[in-house]
Amino acid sequence: MKLGWLLLAYLALALAFARATPPLEASDEARHLGFVVHLARHRMLPVVDASRPGLAAHEALQPPLYYAVGAALVGPRRLRDAERFYVPMPGSTIGRADLPGTRFMFTPPDRPRPRGTLAAVRRLRLLSIALGAATVLLAWATARTLSPDDPDTALFAAALVALNPMFLFIGSSVNNDNLVTVLSAACVLASCRASFAPARTRDAIVAGVAIGVALLAKASALVLVPPLLYRIAAAAPDRRAAARAAGAALGAAALVAGWWVVRNLVLYGEPFATTLQAVLAGNLRPSWQPLALLREWDGFVKSFWGVFGGFNVIYADGVYDAFFLLSALGVASVLVALARPGLGRDPRVRALALLAAGNLLAVAAWTSRLLGSQGRLLFPSSTAIAVLAALGVAALPARARRVTQVAVPAFLAAASAWACLVLIPDAYAVP
């Protein structure tokens, strides 16, 4: 398979996911659209009041970049009738795939659909699909940068991203995860290609600006900071040079995204308004539970690979068993990559590992306070994870390597096709 064919497969599957999932029925899509509606109508950021949450609810506290782009793309006229979508469906089984009942969260299927909002949702989903395609390209380019003489490894890394059913599902919905994922992938590629030599402070400044832009997409981009500081420290001849470059990078990031943090501090008393967001979402745990992610690892792994709809459309257990095995093999492959002579000592590779580990720790911290262990929260480091896994597979004996590089993408493609062509359409079939 060549890169062009992989991109075509990604686009075909993503469009099929977009067609299969009814408007606003993807995870949190209604709330993300609500933020776009507010910006398109009012042309100013919302000031969130817990007593009047609005269509966006807790998502109105997200950084605004994705929604600003979306509002500019669709305009206010298409969204005049958006409220007609936000009619709760009686008997909905949100978050409970094990219960009988309808999978629809909003607007009973026999109600007339507002055409303007339908067109806006389609356009915003196409934006997300385009961002996903860019992420796939960036994953390929990152692997090519680290292993320039091995095109098969680069293609395998790109396939691990492109054919992940959950990546395709979220990537075909209205969701700011898609923007922070592609911006994180761009930061990863830039970090792998930059020298961060003491005489090139510009590299640190550019990296800081990129992270600042990513932070305006989603606060989870903070996980990009430790790998950047590590790359700077590894390239610097002494502590003074490292401090100078790190200061330049952090200063650049603060200039780009600092206003958003200050605004939150002024309005909500926290840099990212986390408490208010949890109150509005209704997912604040009664107490701090530092080991929550370990206890909920089953759902965490499942939702990295594929849990659809309002967390109420799932695969059969056998498919998840295969995903558990694939996850274990992926972790083993990452460890092999880090143990490979020469490769494991490369600061660029270590930075990728630091990003993946930092993202996992950030999710664990988030889960210790909030309900809902979602594997898709690892998507900001999905490029790093895929590249490391691909580099580990490259160390296998030739035959095992070839089999893995064919079998894994084939399984992911089959699972994705089953989800978007059978599983999701059946879940939303109207008798």
Model regions and ranges:
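Signature aromatic-anchored transmembrane alpha helix within multi-pass, membrane-resident enzymes
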Residues: 7-8, 250-254, 396-428
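Perimembrane helix-loop-helix junctions
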Residues: 193, 224-254, 261
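Interfacial juxtamembrane loops and adjacent helix segments
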Residues: 38-127, 282-288, 294, 298, ...
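Membrane-interface transmembrane helices that cradle and orient dolichyl/undecaprenyl
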Residues: 144-149, 187-206, 214, 233
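Membrane-interface alpha helices of multi-pass inner-membrane proteins
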Residues: 157, 203-219, 224-227
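Transmembrane-helix signature of polytopic, membrane-embedded enzymes
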Residues: 4, 97-115, 139-163
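Membrane-lumen/periplasm interface segments of multi-pass, membrane-embedded glycan/lipid transferases
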Residues: 265-339
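Short helix- or helix-capping micro-motifs
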Residues: 10, 157-162, 189, 211, ...
